[in-house]
Amino acid sequence: MAVNIAILGFGTVGTGLPTLLSENKEKLAKILDEEIVISKVLMRDNKAIEKARSQGFNYDFVLNLDDILADSEISIVVELMGRIEPAKTYITQAIEAGKNVVTANKDLLAVHGVELRSLAQKHHVALYYEAAVAGGIPILRTLANSFSSDKITHLLGILNGTSNFMMTKMSEEGWTYDESLAKAQELGYAESDPTNDVDGIDASYKLAILSEFAFGMTLAPDDIAKSGLRSIQKTDVEIAQQFGYVLKLTGEINEVDSGIFAEVSPTFLPKSHPLASVNGVMNAVFIESEGIGDSVFYGAGAGQKPTATSVLADIVRIVKRVKDGTIGKSFNEYARSTSLANPHDIENKYYFSVETPDSTGQLLLLVELFTSENVSFEQVLQQKGNGKRAVVVIISHKINRVQLSAIQDKLNQEKDFKLLNRFKVLGD
């Protein structure tokens, strides 16, 4: 027998599926005792069809989703179009038509995941999306299965390959933000509009999905604090290294007694931290749990073959669940009420880069300002000034989010001081 699937969108990942099906044909046959067949492919227009055929692909290419929905032989629809629309509409229609769905669309899932999962359960079909987070790392299924008997207290990830590539260039080769972005765009890692990558939006979408699997809580995009790379200067990167850290864009979730706190931000990681050596476009997820302890999952965050492999794994899982009669079960079965942490309960050390007048007594004034909010210094570095302005760099002891906000407000209100940058610092 054959399992017939349809693909919506035949770009980088979509064109990688046929190769994987061919390379793993024998293994898949032994696992499933069935063959997975690409029955139809939805294309954008006739020009796209001609291009695909010129590349040697001879599938039943269609321009109308109804051709797929009306085909009773097709049991799985694989959405690889990206963006929220028309993907949301197409997935909704596929679910309502009784089709199981696989998608790699993190943007869609972060914004409309609750609605789509509810619809899938209503129609007793599967909605799987392993490839939506850290494409080549099977992190979602690992969280759903291997950590089902464990309590996760902390998750830290490098979740965006583009920003990690840029930070690697800035850290290892001394490039500026603009230079590293230009190279990322030249290599095709970053879009012409890099907003989602450099402002932490892409990573926040992935973090929202990870929250559901690791903590059982659904986060709206606005529940996640976000800051990106645009303000980072070469001096920030150099000072991080001087103090024994590496600067990375991370996504982090902490659970405390009052709830969870999620944030995407540039972070000073100790050079000894497992994620400090994750470079280039690679992704990694670091997990602290009460049972297992510390775990690290590392792999490609994107790319044709890694992402297509995760997509195919979802297809295989659906076929197996259909055979054993458990297809109606949710991809993630761990859910509880969402509780956001009290900002008084979230503590970290912080790096502050502050521009001051280059005159006697300014450091003392800065100390007094921080002391007024009960913030003490772990490390201080006063850089050589130009006679008019100087820069003071501070790493604080641990402070909570309320203290952090108060310090930032006071610095911004002081006419003689200018807060250049503020980054989270991990480590004891």
UniProtKB/Swiss-Prot annotation:
Spans traversing the lipid bilayer: none
UniProt EC number: 1.1.1.3
Name of the protein in question: Homoserine dehydrogenase
Molecular functions per Gene Ontology: homoserine dehydrogenase activity; metal ion binding; NAD+ binding; NADP binding
Residues that hold NADP(+) according to the record: V13, R44, K106, G188, E191, G303
Record-linked InterPro entries: ACT_dom, Asp/hSer_DH_NAD-bd, HDH, HDH_cat, HDH_CS, NAD(P)-bd_dom_sf
Pathway it works in: Amino-acid biosynthesis; L-methionine biosynthesis via de novo pathway; L-homoserine from L-aspartate: step 3/3; Amino-acid biosynthesis; L-threonine biosynthesis; L-threonine from L-aspartate: step 3/5
Gene3D superfamilies in UniProt: 3.30.70.260, Dihydrodipicolinate Reductase, domain 2, NAD(P)-binding Rossmann-like Domain
Note accompanying the cofactor annotation: A sodium ion is seen in the structure; a metal ion may subtly affect the relative position of the nucleotide-binding region to influence enzyme activity, and could increase the stability of the enzyme.
Keywords: Amino-acid biosynthesis, Metal-binding, Methionine biosynthesis, NAD, NADP, Oxidoreductase, Sodium, Threonine biosynthesis
Binding site for Na(+): E130, V133, G135, I137
Residues where NAD(+) binds: V13, G303
